[in-house]
Amino acid sequence: MFASCHCVPRGRRTMKMIHFRSSSVKSLSQEMRCTIRLLDDSEISCHIQRETKGQFLIDHICNYYSLLEKDYFGIRYVDPEKQRHWLEPNKSIFKQMKTHPPYTMCFRVKFYPHEPLKIKEELTRYLLYLQIKRDIFHGRLLCSFSDAAYLGACIVQAELGDYDPDEHPENYISEFEIFPKQSQKLERKIVEIHKNELRGQSPPVAEFNLLLKAHTLETYGVDPHPCKDSTGTTTFLGFTAAGFVVFQGNKRIHLIKWPDVCKLKFEGKTFYVIGTQKEKKAMLAFHTSTPAACKHLWKCGVENQAFYKYAKSSQIKTVSSSKIFFKGSRFRYSGKVAKEVVEASSKIQREPPEVHRANITQSRSSHSLNKQLIINMEPLQPLLPSPSEQEEELPLGEGVPLPKEENISAPLISSSPVKAAREYEDPPSEEEDKIKEEPLTISELVYNPSASLLPTPVDDDEIDMLFDCPSRLELEREDTDSFEDLEADENAFLIAEEEELKEARRALSWSYDILTGHIRVNPLVKSFSRLLVVGLGLLLFVFPLLLLLLESGIDLSFLCEIRQTPEFEQFHYEYYCPLKEWVAGKVHLILYMLGCS
């Protein structure tokens, strides 16, 4: 029998869901309430069952919006440890949520479209506009002063329309909470652009111009993950349509494009990126606050790489973050890729759905600015989650410093929407080119993985001083041993040798009796002995194979394939080379000491 429709009012929106329900009490107890916060801060609530999968909830939200280009979006939730997660479509919602119902989730943009011009429907562009608006307010979208003023003017034009002196007082911009920190200078510039440059633009046009400007910025689409690098410096990792990016302060210090990313993996709290730089393989390591944060970072990287890199979803394979001898986590992105989404959008032939815009004017007192970025990690100015995001996703804590006004630099390009459209029609060939402003310039630096790992250089003379040969008393004393002493030592040596031979015969006889069954042994000891023998045999086989792979110059195809795997390179650089240098140093020291003697 069918259950009645559940329609729960929340905010300004409601949502209807129909599901099967039996008349048993057990079935009724399996119903769970779920609240989803939308991009305009309204909420919808529904009831789900224990077996309901994540895709069911995503589809119902998209049906509520009448959204067809839904592959850009996802649902995010937070576990009791304040760790964020993306709801997986193919898994049960109940099994993914580690809290008791009712559940609270957020509907957000998961994959940012690389080319806003290829978005077919106005509804999709409006939802992306709301996400960009949130990113601007939360401090995730860094930009110059002129770009910030233009983005703010687009938001004002989209929500208020043309400037009207009768309706808009002198300080009308101060009623809008657009940026984490708005100066009067920035507000005056927004008013100037709103009055003179955007007049006559409808809300869809103003929103589209904002997307054209935002997608040219370096931090467009970056969801920052706070980490520590090998030197202990706080960095923010992100994934964009171009590739894997690393930020320190207000600058992008590293970019590896998706075709050059060989593998993403994690072990405990350490996240590894193995990629190609100038035809040479390099491995970057970053440390997160918890293993759960590291796994979330890895899964986000795997999904973004699959979405932006591949031409077809059939090319996506299951990825394993495995160690050399142990099985690790396995994960596979199950959605469409960017090219498939664009192709599907081009085939949409329906009448565009009506877009219900919410005219939201946020007051400055509606948000608290006293939340901390992440537990046990020092916050930085760039890419900080917003106060409202922290209320949804992160624990309470101390205040977060906000970007200062003097950190906003001179304009980079004109704020004219016509010029912005022209810039999009002729985009730069490389994302890291044509960046010329300070101090918010995001500059591409040459990455040297050994620069921060090697100790201070030491001269050869100083190294030799570390291995000074000590004086030996044997060289200074005379040979005073007599013939009688030497003969006595020889007799003692013969006696000791005979005793050792007797012990060896007894050990061999005992081993033979055990093998033939004349002596009964504990089965546990016998199993352990067999395991020890097998382990020694494998060691005798694996050790020569490793030497063959590491030291020989044999150019066989299967040996080359093994040498080129990221796991083997990690073992070679992190374990084998240090061990080899240590052994070589000890041998060099012994030979040097023997040479001195």
UniProtKB/Swiss-Prot annotation:
<dbReference type="InterPro" id="IPR035963">
    <property type="entry name" value="FERM_2"/>
</dbReference>
<dbReference type="Pfam" id="PF08736">
    <property type="entry name" value="FA"/>
</dbReference>
<dbReference type="InterPro" id="IPR018980">
    <property type="entry name" value="FERM_PH-like_C"/>
</dbReference>
<dbReference type="InterPro" id="IPR014352">
    <property type="entry name" value="FERM/acyl-CoA-bd_prot_sf"/>
</dbReference>
<feature type="domain" description="FERM">
    <location>
        <begin position="32"/>
        <end position="312"/>
    </location>
</feature>
<dbReference type="InterPro" id="IPR018979">
    <property type="entry name" value="FERM_N"/>
</dbReference>
<feature type="region of interest" description="Disordered">
    <location>
        <begin position="383"/>
        <end position="403"/>
    </location>
</feature>
<dbReference type="InterPro" id="IPR019747">
    <property type="entry name" value="FERM_CS"/>
</dbReference>
<dbReference type="GO" id="GO:0031032">
    <property type="term" value="P:actomyosin structure organization"/>
</dbReference>
<keyword id="KW-0472">Membrane</keyword>
<keyword id="KW-0812">Transmembrane</keyword>
<dbReference type="InterPro" id="IPR000299">
    <property type="entry name" value="FERM_domain"/>
</dbReference>
<dbReference type="InterPro" id="IPR000798">
    <property type="entry name" value="Ez/rad/moesin-like"/>
</dbReference>
<feature type="transmembrane region" description="Helical">
    <location>
        <begin position="531"/>
        <end position="551"/>
    </location>
</feature>
<dbReference type="GO" id="GO:0008092">
    <property type="term" value="F:cytoskeletal protein binding"/>
</dbReference>
<dbReference type="InterPro" id="IPR019749">
    <property type="entry name" value="Band_41_domain"/>
</dbReference>
<dbReference type="InterPro" id="IPR019748">
    <property type="entry name" value="FERM_central"/>
</dbReference>
<dbReference type="GO" id="GO:0005856">
    <property type="term" value="C:cytoskeleton"/>
</dbReference>
<dbReference type="InterPro" id="IPR014847">
    <property type="entry name" value="FA"/>
</dbReference>
<dbReference type="Pfam" id="PF00373">
    <property type="entry name" value="FERM_M"/>
</dbReference>
<dbReference type="Pfam" id="PF09380">
    <property type="entry name" value="FERM_C"/>
</dbReference>
<protein>
    <recommendedName>
        <fullName>FERM domain-containing protein 3</fullName>
    </recommendedName>
</protein>
<keyword id="KW-1133">Transmembrane helix</keyword>
<comment type="function">
    <text>Putative tumor suppressor gene that may be implicated in the origin and progression of lung cancer.</text>
</comment>
<dbReference type="InterPro" id="IPR011993">
    <property type="entry name" value="PH-like_dom_sf"/>
</dbReference>
<dbReference type="InterPro" id="IPR029071">
    <property type="entry name" value="Ubiquitin-like_domsf"/>
</dbReference>
<dbReference type="GO" id="GO:0016020">
    <property type="term" value="C:membrane"/>
</dbReference>
<dbReference type="Pfam" id="PF09379">
    <property type="entry name" value="FERM_N"/>
</dbReference>
